[in-house]
UniProtKB/Swiss-Prot annotation:
Gene Ontology MF terms in the entry: ATP binding; protein histidine kinase activity
Protein name: Sensor protein BceS
GN (gene name): bceS
Extracellular side: 34
Cellular component GO terms, alphabetical: plasma membrane
Length: 334
């Protein structure tokens, strides 16, 4: 701030120093003027000018320092009262800009809310014909066509479900109902929903649930597990997916292990990034790069930690670590 102040006042400083140099020059060339007396006056003037600059620095920069607070929260009351006409002009301009920004932000929030409501309404509307399509597919007798249509129906269903949860996830804290959940029925339901896809790809499941229940939100935990299972099925062929739960110390862990293509080591730190698919399979148009991102985002307010271990070409293990009860007290209170 001092450097900026001196740069701002450089014309003042240059003019003052030129004036003092001129006085010394005149005293030097004019023998009738005592050079020592003029030098003493110049010394006093410079000392006074330094004190004056320090006083003006303290006074003038107080207003501009208060602008830093305004930048963080757009609160005009945080700005110091202007003490000069120029500061008053700045304050009026900032107040006008603040009001404009707040109105613009309010309009954008309203537009986003309307867009979210319209999209969610559309998704719910689409679910009606999807349900009818599923009933029609179930009554089909030609097995090959039925299997293919069931797979395509499932893809649409999963994409709609992902989109629906993506819009809801911003308000997840208002949508939590934390309770003890039985893992077996929850996992079995998710596997059943993927049945047609798994049959088509020749995938089975090896389920070993030593830990029977966890403390979480049933709907959002199901969504997280759904993303891990769809990810495992998508990248596996003719193999088994292992699902295990067990106690590790005071915490419960749930593992989903596949024998698929695995993840390139350089991609592992990025798999939870929004929109990231892969650096090795850009031809894969089916991947959206949203499933694991949403799973990670949904896990955070539930205090679920997601770890991943992968060997490229050999498979991947995702581990969910659930919190103990006393870690969950503030979430339960929500």
């Amino acid at each position: 701030m001092i450097k900026a102040f001196l740069i701002e006042r450089r014309s003042w400083i240059a003019a003052f120093l030129f004036q003092q140099a001129l006085m010394l020059f005149i005293a030097f060339v004019d023998p009738s003027i005592s050079f020592g007396n003029v030098l003493y006056m110049v010394y006093l003037c410079i000392l006074f000018f330094i004190i004056f600059l320090w006083f003006r620095y303290r006074k003038e920069t107080a207003f501009y320092k208060s602008l830093k607070t305004w930048e963080n929260n757009l609160d005009v009351t945080a700005i110091n009262e202007p003490e000069t006409p120029f500061e008053a002009m700045v304050e009026r301009s900032i107040a006008g800009q603040t009001e404009h920004l707040k109105q613009t932000a309010a309009r954008h929030r309203l537009a986003l809310e309307n867009e979210k409501d319209e999209l969610m309404a559309w998704i719910h509307e689409v679910k009606t014909p999807l349900t009818a399509m599923h009933l029609i597919i179930d009554r089909m007798e030609e097995k090959a066509l039925k299997s293919q249509l069931s797979y395509e129906w499932l893809r649409i269903h999963l994409l709609l479900d992902q989109q629906l949860h993506q819009k809801r996830i911003s308000f997840i804290e208002n949508d939590l109902s934390v309770e003890f959940i039985q893992l077996q029925p929850l996992i079995f339901k998710e596997i059943k929903d993927l049945q047609s896809w798994c049959i088509q790809k020749g995938i089975g499941f090896d389920i070993q649930l030593e830990a029977k229940e966890v403390l979480s939100d049933a709907k959002w935990l199901a969504f997280i597990i759904r993303q891990l299972l769809t990810n495992a099925v998508k990248y596996s062929e003719a193999s088994e997916i292992e699902i295990k739960s067990f106690q590790k110390g005071e915490q419960t862990q749930l593992q989903v292990k596949d024998c698929g293509r695995g993840i390139d080591p350089k991609d592992v730190p990025r798999i939870f990034d929004k929109g990231f698919t892969s650096t090795t399979d850009h031809h894969d148009q089916a991947s959206t790069g949203m499933g694991l991102y949403l799973a990670k985002k949904a896990a955070a307010p539930l205090l679920i930690h997601i770890d991943v271990e992968s060997e490229f070409g050999a498979g991947t293990v995702f581990t969910l670590t659930f919190p103990i009860r006393n870690q969950f007290e503030h979430v339960i209170s929500v």
